[in-house]
């Protein structure tokens, strides 16, 4: 699989802080995405702070990460992203992203999102054989909040499985898609170096980021 080099998108400006929210399922590398963002910011000479907002990221449970990036470390006071202050949402899980807690962080005219449209059933719902995810309603809820032009949906889990043989790379694909759409104020060089420093499945993760 030969991946052509990506053109550098027009990166977003950082006014005070640039606020990212990463959602997903515990055990799928959500916390790793937050750590990669923070490390890449450091490598780019910027300030960064991240925190996990769902207690322990237990396997199979919903989790979300708040990450603030600033031009200088001293510009970051609080790490928690406040209501209507998310600049970008990296949505690794549709149900979590369309939940009221995450929607409250978004604002029409400010927030943009890339969301995995794959249907992942979490927690107690896995024990209910009749339960199905109202995907269309969840997609519409996000579009209603920030506008259809500000959100991109794709089944990144299936794409990851098809292209790289495992859905575990879906979250890094979503990060790559967000970066390619000008939603992450960090250089490609810093993000790739952060993936290398993380040291896990480096080649596959870089491919996933670039797809």
Ranges and model annotations:
Residues 1-23, 28-211:
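Active-site cofactor/cluster-binding pocket
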